[in-house]
Amino acid sequence: QKSYGKKGQDVVEMNWKAIDAGVDAIHKVDVPASWSNPEADPAPKALAGRPELVKQIRDVMEPIARMDGDSLPVSSFVANANGEWEQGASAYEKRGTAVNVPEWDAAKCVGCNQCAFVCSHATIRPFLLTADELAAAPAQTKSRDNKLTPEYKFVMAVSPLDCMGCGECVTVCPTKAITMVPQDSQADQQAVFDYCVANISKKATKMADDTVMGSQFNQPLLEFSGSCAGCAETSYARLITQLFGEKMYISNATGCSSIWGGTASISPYTVNKDSGHGPAWCNSLFEDNAEHGLGLYIGQKTIRENLIKEIAEVAGSDKASAELKAAFEKFLETKNNTKANDEPAKALIAELEKAAAAGCEKSAEILKSKQFIAKKSVWIFGGDGWAY
């Protein structure tokens, strides 16, 4: 009466009725006796992956995921005191948040890969399988012939537990080969996706990496992030990692991209499964990203230029092998081309390792910074808040 009397007696009486209705609606819930003595949870399954990553998952990520992060002792983070975290943790989350997920119809598909191209979370991916690889795949694996690669079978794999259900793949598909269906109906496709990710490597084809179709056969080194469903930002970032990911530095402004890209212990950036290398990512202060990115560029450029001078001294020595001299010449021919410099850099490092093993102290010193020898690219990621 005191609170609502000024609004009229009708309003007061409606509040009284609401209170009475609440009291009348109370009913007893009988708790099963078995709840007082529950069975112990089964032991967690062994996790596959790099030992240091698995340890991070068990010791840090899992307690946080079950809302138990406040109980973690400081010792849990000692290995991360400098801010470094293992890459690839997001692949272990398997959140299963989507109500509906894509179902791929192999008969209607033309293999354009546009669905994978627009996917914000890298949860729908194309693979090319040999006959033996297809025979070893789960029985429920769907495949089709591909005119551009007749020696392989084409598979579009979907991860139901990582998909966010945005439906962008359906929107972009030119032949309506994808439909959204209840997640439960696609549960058996998780094994197909996991098999392809773990066992199928990229095949050499005539499809260029700088095309929509060809680029999507490259492993995405940004996957299963915490961005919103259908986020275009992560679609762009994922594509960049498919083109430059093993040799890229990212200076990231504070904003959405630092939240989905750098949440402590749950990095969506990952490493190439063959080389073990992935993007180097760092988050600057909100307003300083341009300077931070420029600093990264100048720093790695200066280190590399000094290394090349030192390698030139070793290669120019009378004691240098003919193989080392030839490898250095090949390296110099491509030193400003990130993609073309890859193999020459590996060959040069191999020759430097031989020289170091033979007692060349200068080569041994150079190899301490060998990660800077190959040509890299430096990227600045930021949103409107930073840019303007």
Predicted segments with their positions:
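Ferredoxin-type iron-sulfur electron-transfer modules and their immediate structural context
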Residues: S3-C163, V170-W379, G385-A387
